[in-house]
Amino acid sequence: HMLQHMLLIYVSAPLIVTGLPPELVDGFLKDRPRLTRGLAFLTHPVAGGLIFTLCFSMWHFPELYEAALRSRPLHVIEHWSMFLPAILMVWPLFSLSTRLPRIGYGMAIFYSFGLMIADLPLWAVLIFGDHPIYETYRLAPRVSELSAAADMILGAVVMKGFNEIFALLCMGYAFFAWYQREK
C-alpha cells in the first residue's frame, strides 16, 4: 500500500500540476484576488512542504493508520489528504501558471533538499523501530517470508526511496536548467 501512496504523491501530483493548462489556471484566478492570495500562501514552498509533511506523517500515527485500514471512507479521506497536500508541495516545482509561478532554480534545489530532510523523523521511526508499530500488520498472516518488522522496514525504504529519487530528479533538473540558462 506504500507504493500506492508514493504513486499518488510523487507521480500523480506532479503530472496533475504539469498538465494544468496555464491559461486555465490564470484565467480562473484572474478576477479572484483573495483566492489567488490564499493559494499563493498555500503553494509557497514553506507552507506547501509543511502541510504535506504534517498530513503525510499524521496518517502514520498507529491509531490513524489502523482506523484507515478498518474504514473504507476514512481510507479514501486518507488518500485525498495525502494527494491534495502533495499538489501544494509540488506546485512550486512544476507550476506553469504566471499567477502562481514556480520558484527559481536555486530555490528549487534548496526546497527539494528540504523535502528530503522533512520526512526523516517519520522514516527513522519506521526503519529503526525494533518491532512493528501497526497492529494489523503484526497480526496479519505472512504472505511472504518477511516478518512484520521487515515488512514495515521495506515500506519505509520504498517511501524514502521515492522521496529521494523525486527530490534528486528535481534538484538535477533545476541545476542543469539553471546552468543552461546562464550559458
Go through each PLM region and give its residues.
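Alpha-helical membrane segments of multi-pass proteins
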Residues: 1-183
